[in-house]
Structures are given as C-alpha cells and as structure tokens.
Amino acid sequence: MISNVINQIDAIAQNTGDLIAYDELGRTHTYAQLKSGSDSLAAHIDSLNLPTGAPIMVYGGQQFEMIASFLGSTKSGHAYIPVDKSSADERLTDILEIGKPALVIAVDELPIEITSVPVIDPKALTSIFDNETSYQITHPVEGDDNFYIIFTSGTTGKPKGVQISHRNLISFADWMLSDDFNWPEKSQVLSQPPYSFDLSVMDWAPALLSSSTLKALPKETADDFKTLFATLPKLDLNIWVSTPSFADVALLDPNFTQENLPQLTHFLFCGEVLTSTTAQKLLSRFPNATVYNTYGPTEATVAVSGLPITEAVIATNDKMPIGYVKSDTTIKIQDPDGQDVPAGETGEIVICGPSVSKGYLNNPEKTAQAFKQIDGHQAYKTGDLATMDSSGLLHYRGRSDFQIKLHGFRIELEEVAQQLQQSHFVAQAAAVPRYDDEGKVKQLLAVIVASDNSFEKPMQLTNAIKDELKDIMMPYMVPGRFIYREAMPLTPNGKIDLKGLIAEVNGDA
C-alpha cells in the first residue's frame, strides 16, 4: 500500500538513484536527478510566497522537466495543472481564466504572452534545476489536497477542471500495482498520452512508484507513422499504455509483433472502446502479452474497472467488457431517476469510492449536476451507459450523448463502428450522422481506414464490407454512405476525433 506518492518516489531516488526514471528518445534522467530537480523547484516556489494551495500551471510536451515540475509543485503544497503544448491559444486562455493558477511554469515557450501571473520561462527553469538545493518537505500536497487538476474538453462551452486529490491518486495507483495487473518492477513503460490527458497518469504514476523507466514518445514522433514504426522496436518496452486508437495506428505496421518487441508483456487500454478486432490482432501478434481493457472517467481518477482480454472473452462477447470494479469502489447502474436497475438492464454508470473527485474547480454548478452523495460517499454520474451481469462484469453500452435516432431507430454510433471493424477489410472505423437543416439526422455515414485490398474502386470495397457484415449488422444500422481515408483524425489525447468528423461531414469544419 502506498502512503505517500512523493515520499515513495523520493525513497527510490535515495536508495537507487542511478536508475533511469525518464528516457526521451535517448535523453535520459535518473531518479536522483528527478529528486534533485523537483527539490530545487520546490524551494524556488516556496520563495515566491504564493497563496497557500493555489494551483500551478505547467505547460509543455513529453519531457522530463514536465514530470519534475509536477513533483516540485506538489512538494511545495501546490496542485499542478498540466497543459500540453499542442493546445489551442483559446484553451490556454480559458484554463488561465477558470483555473486561476498562481504561477505558470513554461517547459516550452508559451504561444501567448501571460502577464496576469508570474511565469517561469524555459531558461529560468533550467537555471532552477541546475541550482541544486537541499530541500526539507514540510508542507506537501497530501490527503484530500488537490494533487493535479486536469481540464476536460467538455461537450459544450468552457473546459472543466477536474480536481484529483492525493487520496484519489493513491486509490488508483494502489490498484494499478496490485495483483489485478501484475505490473513488474523496473519496467520500461510507454509514455505517449499527453500529460494534459489523464490516461498519462496510468503510465507515469505506477511507473515512478515501481522503480520503472518512462519511455517518452513525443507527439512529433507519434504523429509521423514512418518515424513511429521505426522508433517503437528501439524502446524495448515491457508495458504499453495508450488509447486503442493509438494501438490501431501501430498495428498498421506489419512489423509491430512480438518478434520485434520481444519484451512487451502488458497492453493497458483506456479512454475509448477497445474493439474485439483490435484485441484479437494484439493477441495474435503478441502471444506472450496480456491485453487489459480498463474503464473510467477523468472524474474518478483514470480508471475504476478492468479485466484481461483473453481468447475466451473475445469468443463469448460481441463487445469487449470493461471489467470488474476495483475493490475499494462501488459501481451502480441507475435509471434517470437515480434508482438502481435490475442486473442485466441498461442504465447510467454511477461511481462511488475513494478515487472519485471532489468536483470541478471553481464550478459549483457543474459539480452539483454531475456529483452526488451515496451513503455519505462521493459519487459521480458518468453519462456512460452499461449493463452489469450477475457476476459483476460491466458491459459498456455507449455514451448517452453519442446516440442518434434515424428513421425511428435509436442507434449507438460506437456500436456501429465496432461492427464495421469486424470486417477484415476495415482497419479503423467511425460512424457519424449527417443532419438536415432542422438538426434532424438524415443519413448515417461510415468513415473507414481500409485494410490492404485489391479492389480497384471504392464501391467494390463498400460492397465487400457490406456483404461480410450482412449477418452481423441490423439493416437500419448499415451506413448509407462509406467514406475512405488514409488515416483517422485523432484528438490531442489520441482518441478518434468523432466530433471533428461530425463537423466535417456536416460542413462545419
């Protein structure tokens, strides 16, 4: 059991300081350097006399200095707000306005001028890290203090800052390092999701708490397929953490196999639906690896349920289940009135437990809408639909806000995409609606990245896909039009950009 995140990482630095904590394509830093840098930064932050507990924004990409800044902030008693360097200027401005940070640490050069709060620019930050300082931790983030605040994109309007406490983080990290995942110590762990996406916590937290090495994959490398495919085998990975969409990109390379990545033993997925197609490809190509599907919203600290996906699971489930809830947490499946539904019936996932956030920063109205108390414990209403069978296994049924109605039929977009991917002609798929002038759905479209094939015309490929799926898909779920692309657009978080595709097909992009 972890009692204190900061102390445990520092203890590794004191006992085995020469271990590599961070490897950014050969630019390495040890645990001793992580402690030294974060200590020096914490001492500097203390000297600024910032308001007690006020958050600190940390801006940058996949760099060691980001992690060191996170730890330096929390050692000095301040939560950090991670902001990725690929963020739009407007998002940066929104986060400054809503989050009200007392300080901005710029690991990379800021794209806008910030005058409302003090800024530590990259040059000054380097000087602080180089100025080794002995630091005594006396007022760190602990207990219910916020450890980090991650801003979600939100379905509409301004982003919301999800507050995650030290206690929330420990609940998650303890689970990741439990027997449920058999996370080996001193592993080589892929660090690909941006730190502004809470999936990144699934790599850095258990890695740094288990004497492991984070193998950073900068966005520039991940976005260039040729460079990505050449880089992955050189990382000597043991543990892979990403969205399923990023794994689908890697699977486009026929050399992404156990033979070329022999030490890879764990795939951990979260953030979007894992299809049976993707899971089967991974099991076939990596026979020595275990594929874990996990589920959870940012508001409940990354993930709260999971299970290993085996051949037996694939054979007995049309869609990949999202697992069993972790032992310190309760999941209820409820109707719109907040009443529990019978086992096997669809309802909203409501999460109750020690990893549930206290709410949205400086946004009591949205907090009151999404959070509630159940038997004296904090609970979060996810907006995700699921069923729970008699064994406690959760089966995801989609987002309540990604359902459409076409010709009187209710259609779940993610379900259509999953069924499309069962065709061996389809590498990746998304289903998107086209609306008429009155906002009513008039057509369902499929956006496809095709597998290698010998068809000369798109119509031949479309007919072949439809023929393969005619016994799987209900006729009303078959898209009326198929659009083919070389690659799917992804959000900065590595998920398929479904909202962007919807805007594109409706002429709003």
Question: Model segments located where?
Answer:
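Gly/Ser/Thr-rich phosphate-binding loop
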Residues: 210-212, 237-241, 251-317, 321
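Short hydrophobic alpha-helical segments of the AMP-binding
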Residues: 69-77, 169, 206-208, 482
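Conserved AMP-binding
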Residues: 60-63, 84, 193-197, 220, ...
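Conserved pre-ATP/AMP-binding loop-to-beta segment of ANL
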Residues: 134-151, 158, 183-189, 195
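AMP-binding/adenylate-forming domain of the ANL superfamily
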Residues: 1-149, 164, 275-279, 327-330, ...
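AMP-dependent adenylate-forming
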Residues: 4-6, 104-114, 118-139, 169, ...
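Conserved AMP-binding/adenylation subdomain of ANL enzymes
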Residues: 160-190, 198-238
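Conserved S/T- and glycine-rich ATP-binding loop of Class I adenylate-forming
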Residues: 56, 73, 146, 152-155, ...
